[in-house]
């Protein structure tokens, strides 16, 4: 999975990015999520962890980070345990904010015109 951060324009509602000047787009690698997106269109939602905390590896791990019960589909087999790579393309040069499943080398191989910060 890959999350791409871009500069937000005036078409991005305040409630989507809390008024920040950037917005993130996550490209999932999950059959059920891709099917849902195909049927309903784009989805908007936060990460399933508290900012700065490690991502849960099981639904119960995710639920334990929050102080209330969370509705959801418990499908622990679908969790890979590997976070998405966060690629920031909002500046002059690309930056990887979090290394995940997709490496900088793979990005450069597939899209050689992307220039990274040193």
PLM feature segments, named:
Residues 1-118:
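Active-site-adjacent structural elements in enzyme catalytic cores
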């Amino acid at each position: 999975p890959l999350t791409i951060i871009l500069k937000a324009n005036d078409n991005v509602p305040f409630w989507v990015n809390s008024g920040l000047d950037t917005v993130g787009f996550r490209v999932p690698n999950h059959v059920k999520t891709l099917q849902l997106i195909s049927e309903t269109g784009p989805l908007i939602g936060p990460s399933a962890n508290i900012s700065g905390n490690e991502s849960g590896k099981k639904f119960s791990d995710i639920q334990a980070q929050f102080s209330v019960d969370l509705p959801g589909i418990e499908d622990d087999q679908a969790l890979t345990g590997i976070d998405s790579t966060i690629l920031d393309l909002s500046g002059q040069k690309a930056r990887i904010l979090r290394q995940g499943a997709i490496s900088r080398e793979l990005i450069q191989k597939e899209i050689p015109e992307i220039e990274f910060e040193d």
